[in-house]
């Protein structure tokens, strides 16, 4: 798990902060938090990390895709219970799960894993 603390003025830079946070978590996981060297497949993944991501803008959401799977959705504008920049889990390839935000790319201060953003439950505990 990596904590993304940076705030962002624009959603695009917030998404880049999130992607870099996921990369840092991947490196930490692959090296046992610095106890071993980054080699083989893991090193190849880190070397081409930025090229594995696509950001696709839709009407309400921005879809963040890593390789062929949706990493998350980002809310484009305030709507109902969600704020601009909120990170939502994917319900499928085309739509987010609208149960709970997992953080906000504009305000920062959220937790992420290389497998996806974490969110807080009602007791403010981290959950995958």
Positions of predicted regions on the chain:
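Mixed-charge, Lys/Arg-enriched low-complexity segments
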Residues: 1-15, 95-128
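Negatively charged, low-complexity tracts enriched in Asp/Glu with abundant Ser/Thr
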Residues: 1-55
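Hydrophobic transmembrane signal anchors and adjacent membrane-proximal interface regions, especially
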Residues: 4, 36-40, 83, 88, ...
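Amphipathic, interaction-prone secondary-structure segments
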Residues: 41-83
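Intrinsically disordered, low-complexity regulatory segments enriched in Ser/Thr/Pro
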Residues: 69-106
């Amino acid at each position: 798990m990596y904590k993304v603390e940076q705030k962002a003025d624009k959603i695009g830079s917030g998404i880049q902060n999130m992607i870099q946070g996921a990369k840092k978590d991947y490196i930490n996981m692959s090296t046992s938090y610095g106890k071993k060297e980054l080699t083989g497949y893991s090193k190849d993944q880190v070397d081409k990390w930025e090229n594995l991501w696509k950001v696709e803008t839709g009407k309400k959401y921005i879809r963040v895709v890593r390789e062929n799977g949706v990493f998350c959705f980002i809310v484009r504008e305030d709507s109902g219970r969600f704020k601009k920049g909120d990170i939502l889990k994917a319900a499928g390839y085309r739509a987010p799960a609208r149960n709970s935000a997992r953080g906000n790319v504009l305000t920062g201060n959220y937790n992420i894993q290389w497998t996806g953003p974490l969110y807080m439950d009602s007791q403010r505990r981290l959950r995958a």
